[in-house]
UniProtKB/Swiss-Prot annotation:
Pfam families reported in the protein's UniProt record: MRP-S22
InterPro entries given in the database record: Ribosomal_mS22
Protein name per its UniProtKB record: Small ribosomal subunit protein mS22
Location of Phosphoserine modifications: 54
Assembly, per entry: Component of the mitochondrial ribosome small subunit (28S) which comprises a 12S rRNA and about 30 distinct proteins.
One GO molecular-function entry: structural constituent of ribosome
Originating species: Mus musculus (Mouse)
PANTHER family: MITOCHONDRIAL 28S RIBOSOMAL PROTEIN S22, SMALL RIBOSOMAL SUBUNIT PROTEIN MS22
Entry's family note: Belongs to the mitochondrion-specific ribosomal protein mS22 family.
Gene that encodes it: Mrps22
Gene deletion effect: Heterozygous MRPS22 knockout mice are fertile and show no overt abnormalities. Homozygous MRPS22 knockout results in embryonic lethality.
Residues where N6-acetyllysine is found: 210
Domain of life: Eukaryota
């Protein structure tokens, strides 16, 4: 059946025991005039996306399986070092001015309100998932040379049935050359957003994600805003999502601005990135200088979990090192800035000693 040359043509046909609709549209889109997303992203639901359109990863490996981001012990450590600052978690969002609301409470009511605020903060601090980048889709279904040159535009055919998960949704593209292929991930994301709009997401990515605009955002210490927009706009296993997150983490590490993400849902992902890259020195020094030695110890423990064959993990195991001693072992073995870490620890211990003497 030949496609009718109209902006939107619909076909209905019987497919098995259910009715399905396939939609054919020209693969063109107009860029939205707005530059930034106006809607604040909602708390991210953690879950592994289904990838039935890409080739399955090989299961089973002769190597010892390393801890994954969603492992219970990993999540416990990352949640612990993230911290819980209610003032920061519930900081005012940029929105139209409204008169403040004041309430008179008894002590019991205040304690209950605080408890509810803590529970709400834990929901807001739920970490977005960290996934491997999805494999590209390069499946060609047919080469119809007889159609070559009959059209100058691509046509996208989409199954818009409501009972199909988006990862399983059948979407194909007819090229002007006559090639019929499966849509790429980027094409799928755009088309799905057209027919099934997601709040806070656009069909075309905002210009804020261009490198020159990201540098401006970083210079204004708006790293958390960039990551919030990124979570709203992209799928967690997309190349752009991973790229923006890594760029943001590297800028924070370069300038030592770890506090910008502390007590946000992005701190755990940042710590996980540094541990995987064996670049925890800067974060470790920052934690020690902020009197967060317990968090620094947890960070080194996580490092040893991911790199159990390293010299630091081996020596810590032999010495049964704990607490500050665990950090010292790391500083003497695998740290890139070991002298700075030892100096920070020395300063911390001197302060603790002076406080103990004063009391």
């Amino acid at each position: 059946m030949a496609a009718v040359r109209t902006p939107l043509s619909l076909w209905r046909f019987q497919l098995g025991s259910r009715r399905a609709r396939r939609v054919c549209t020209r693969a063109t889109a107009q860029r939205h005039p707005d530059a930034l997303l106006a809607t604040r992203p909602q708390p991210f639901e953690v879950g592994q996306p289904r990838r039935l359109l890409s080739s399955e990863a090989e299961s089973g490996s002769s190597e010892v399986k390393k801890p994954a981001f969603m492992d219970e012990e990993v999540q416990r450590i990352l949640t612990k070092i993230t911290g819980l600052d209610l003032q920061k978690t519930f900081r005012p969002a940029i929105q139209p001015l409204k008169p403040p609301t004041y309430k008179l409470m008894t002590q019991a009511q205040l304690e209950e309100a605080t408890r509810l605020a803590v529970e709400a903060a834990k929901v807001r601090l739920k970490m977005p998932p960290v996934l491997e980048e999805r494999k590209p889709i390069n499946d060609v279904l047919a080469e119809d040379k007889i159609l070559e040159g009959t059209e100058t535009n691509k046509y996208v055919f989409t199954d818009i049935s409501y009972n199909i998960p988006h990862r399983e949704r059948f979407i194909v593209v007819r090229e002007p050359s006559g090639t019929l292929r499966k849509a790429s991930w980027e094409e799928r994301d755009r088309v799905i957003q057209i027919y099934f709009p997601k709040e806070g997401r656009r069909v075309l990515p905002p210009v804020i994600f261009k490198d020159e605009n990201l540098k401006t955002m970083y210079s204004q210490d708006r790293h958390a805003d960039v990551l919030n927009l990124c979570v709203a706009q992209f799928e967690p296993d997309s190349a752009e999502y991973i790229k923006v997150h890594h760029q943001t983490y590297e800028d924070i590490d370069r300038h030592g601005k770890y506090e910008l993400l502390r007590s946000t849902r992005h701190f755990g992902g940042m710590a996980w990135y540094f541990v995987n890259k064996k670049k925890i020195d800067g974060l470790l020094i920052d934690q020690i200088q902020r009197d967060l030695v317990d968090d620094a110890t947890s960070l080194v423990q996580l490092y040893h979990m991911l790199h159990p064959d390293g010299q630091s993990a081996q020596e810590a195991k032999e010495q049964a090192a704990e607490g500050v001693d665990l950090i010292k072992v790391f500083a003497k073995t695998e740290a890139q800035r070991g002298a700075y870490i030892e100096l920070a620890l020395q300063t911390y211990q001197e302060i603790v000693t002076s406080h103990s003497a004063a009391s």
